[in-house]
């Protein structure tokens, strides 16, 4: 169970599988502490500060929705600008917020809400395979792409936007998303006409301002050496 108070100094509680209740204290740019309150009612972090968003576009303004027994939903704002566009920023995809434990550390996790699946109008799924190159034609400017890579270096291109994965994590533009040690890299991407959201294992994400290159309506994966890709799913969304 999680309860969240809104604003740039949000506090939320999370009841974990081991019965322990921890509190997450988050601020601007999605920096956060995980901790508990002592006998004097003072908040005490149990680990060093964490980071969820890896860009400069994570705006403090955000709204949370919660019903007992259901996931906490966050509505966040992407303040990235596109020169010449008649708007400033855009809403991000609503995400489910949870705490994950990896090793001896807790991570704040954000992943697109499950009801995003209701927007899928077409979906292609590929079983596990080893590749050096593949190309998937896209018929929609709004799509969701997910896949898992255990090891290996590769480069992805989505409507002309390039992303690189290696042993350290995922790089796109100025954003560097670190991977969890000894964990497969689970990548989840949602794109529309002016932005691309990238989630790595749920515990690291970024939003990239990107005007889709209509001359390159494809998603491609390229690797110099064979790389095993698991559970590749390309879905077109009705937005």
Where on the chain are the PLM-derived regions?
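Single conserved hydrophobic/aromatic residue that forms the stacking wall/gate
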Residues: 1-12
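Hydrophobic core segments of beta-strands in well-ordered, beta-rich domains
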Residues: 12-28, 71-82
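Poly-acidic low-complexity segments
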Residues: 6, 18, 164-166
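Beta-rich accessory regions
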Residues: 31, 38-59, 64-239
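Alpha-helix capping and helix-loop boundary segments enriched in small/acidic/polar residues
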Residues: 1, 18-19, 23, 50-54, ...
